[in-house]
Amino acid sequence: MNKMTNNKTIWMKPRYVKKKWYVIDASDKVLGRIATEAIKILRGKHKPYYTPHQDLGDNVVIINASKVKLTGKKYFQKIYYRHSRYPGGLYSDTYRTLSERKPTAPLEIAIKGMLPKGPLGRELFRNLKVFADANHKLSSQNLYKLEAN
C-alpha cells in the first residue's frame, strides 16, 4: 500500500494574506546580517503558513544603507563583477567604488543573491525598498520597526 496519499500541498489564497511593512535601520550593522533578516521577512519564513512556492512575505524598507558595515578588509578587497554580454565586456568594482557611486547597490546585490532565481525571486525583490539615508517616501505606510543584530 502506498501511504503517500495524505501528502497535500498547501496553497494560501492571496485574499487571505495581509502584507505588512517592516523598516530596518542598517546604520552600523553588518551587511550580511541585515540581508538575512530582510530575506526572512521577504520570503515569509516568520509566518506559520510559509510555503516556498508562493509570495507570502511582507514588504521591507531598509534605511541608512550607506552606513552599513563590513567585516575584515572587505571594504577594499570585495569585488563585484558584471558583464555587458559583449566579448571582453567584464567590468569589476570594489565595494568602495560601488558604494560611492550607488550606496544602495551592495545591499541590494546581497539580498538579490539570497532570493530564489526565477519569477518568484523577481516578484519578491519588488517587495524590497532600500534607501541610502533615513529619508524615504513610504511614511504613509504603517511601518513596523524591526531590530536586526
Curated annotation (Swiss-Prot):
Looking up CDD domains in the UniProt record yields: Ribosomal_L13
Q: Name one GO biological process term.
A: translation
Does the UniProt entry include the keyword Ribosomal protein? yes
What domain of life?
A: Bacteria
Q: Does the keyword Signal apply?
A: no
Output the Gene Ontology cellular-component terms: cytosolic large ribosomal subunit
Task: Report keywords, A-Z.
Answer: Ribonucleoprotein, Ribosomal protein
The UniProt entry, under SUPFAM superfamilies, shows:
Ribosomal protein L13
For molecular function, the Gene Ontology terms on record are: mRNA binding; structural constituent of ribosome
**What HAMAP family does the entry give?**
Ribosomal_uL13
Q: Which family does it belong to?
A: Belongs to the universal ribosomal protein uL13 family.
* Entry function: This protein is one of the early assembly proteins of the 50S ribosomal subunit, although it is not seen to bind rRNA by itself. It is important during the early stages of 50S assembly.
Q: How does this chain assemble?
A: Part of the 50S ribosomal subunit.
Write the protein's name: Large ribosomal subunit protein uL13
Source species of the chain: Borrelia recurrentis (strain A1)
